[in-house]
Amino acid sequence: MSKYEIENVKLTAPKLDPKDLEYAMTYRYACKKFDSTKKISEDDWNAILQAARLTPTSLGFEPFELLVIQNPDIREKMKAHGWGIQAGLEASHFVVFLSRKKVDLEFDSPYVRYIQETVKQLPAEIDAAYREKYAQFTTSDYKTFESERATFDWSSKQAYIVMANMMTMAAYEGLDSCPLEGFNQDDMTALLGDELGLFDTKHFGIAVMAAFGYRDEEPHRNKTRRTLDEFVTVVE
């Protein structure tokens, strides 16, 4: 078995209590104040990263990468470009989600070739079928190649799924998190990509950020959501 494989062929269906997951998701809230003195254990953090790894992405292309910003000096510099990330930067772990740009998502790009041939190890005939359907998907079905922005937005959708699963795993462990969009993308890209060289801006853009750690205060009010009958329509 290659290092890219995760054995699941012979796994039996899980028999977990769904109430446990529902409880964790109810416990979760967008934490606005983190205890900077409390750190997530290595085992708990690795479980959160495994949730990211196991997340499904469109076509299985995994068009994302994670920057885990633990350097206090870099965190301090980031504050100048993010009006809504200040509290999150005090958390135990701070993640910048990167999404790939169009140059990496062309079917013959080195990245897609790596995914198809090395990670998935697809036979040539299956890869050829992918090529045909991908051309239809990108130009007609979802028009993800209509513009650079359309490609990046599609890629970023995958990063958001990853973030959601990481946050759910954190809640399951009794940890806290907060998804963060309160920053200037251009300025933050200039800082982290161009100035600090943490990623190649030709290939990646910043999709979203998230903080993970321990709450320093309890929620001030109960969670509110629409009722099921307000957003679920059953068509029979």
Where are these regions (language model features)?
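Acidic, surface-exposed loops and disordered segments
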Residues: 1-236
